[in-house]
C-alpha cells in the first residue's frame, strides 16, 4: 500500500510503501485499543493517595466522657471514624494501580491505533523532522499548514534536538522517538506525523 510523503511545508515530495498489516488493518479492534489505553492510564497513576485510619490519627486515647448518665451516645475514642477529626474507614491506601497486559495485546493495540489514524486520513508521513534552529514561532508556522489542533510527532530512533526544543512550548504538540509511540497519545492527538525513519523502524518493531 502506497501513501504520499510530505515535506514540512505540507507539499508532496514522493511516495512510500506502508505495510498493510500495520497501517491498514481491515477491522479495527476498538476493544483492544481501549484495553491498552486503560493499562497505560493505570500505569501512569501515582497511587500515593492515602487517608489515616483510627490507629494513625494523632490524639488522645482517653474516653471522651463517662459511659452512662450524659444522655449522649456512648463513645470510646475521639479518634473513631464517626467523630469529627477522627480516622477514615475504608479510605484510599498507597498502592500500585499497575495491571498486567500481555506484550502481544500491547503490540496489537499499537497496530490498530495506527491503522485507525491512517483510515481517518490523520496519519501523515513526513520526509524529515529536522529544523535548522530551535525556534517555536517557526514550528508553529509549519504546523499551521497541516490545519490541525494537536500533533503527535514520531521520529526515528532519535529526535532532532532543534525540533524537540521548538515543540516544548507549543500547546497540544508532542514529539517522541519511535520507542515512545503509544496507543494513548496516538488516539488522543488529532494528527500523527511520522518521519520516514519512524515508518521503517515501526514496521520492523511491529512485524
Curated annotation (Swiss-Prot):
Gene3D superfamilies: 3.40.1370.10
Molecular function via GO: rRNA binding; structural constituent of ribosome
InterPro entries cross-referenced by the UniProt entry: Ribosomal_uL4, Ribosomal_uL4-like, Ribosomal_uL4_dom_sf
Disulfide bonds: none
Region (Disordered): 50-75
Any Pfam family the entry gives: Ribosomal_L4
Domain of life: Bacteria
GO cellular component: ribonucleoprotein complex; ribosome
Residue ranges of the TM segments: none
Keywords: Ribonucleoprotein, Ribosomal protein, RNA-binding, rRNA-binding
One BP annotation, GO: translation
Keyword Isomerase: no
Its biological purpose: One of the primary rRNA binding proteins, this protein initially binds near the 5'-end of the 23S rRNA. It is important during the early stages of 50S assembly. It makes multiple contacts with different domains of the 23S rRNA in the assembled 50S subunit and ribosome.
Assembly: Part of the 50S ribosomal subunit.
Family to which the UniProt record says this protein belongs: Belongs to the universal ribosomal protein uL4 family.
Protein name: Large ribosomal subunit protein uL4
Organism in which the protein naturally occurs: Rickettsia akari (strain Hartford)
Gene behind the chain: rplD
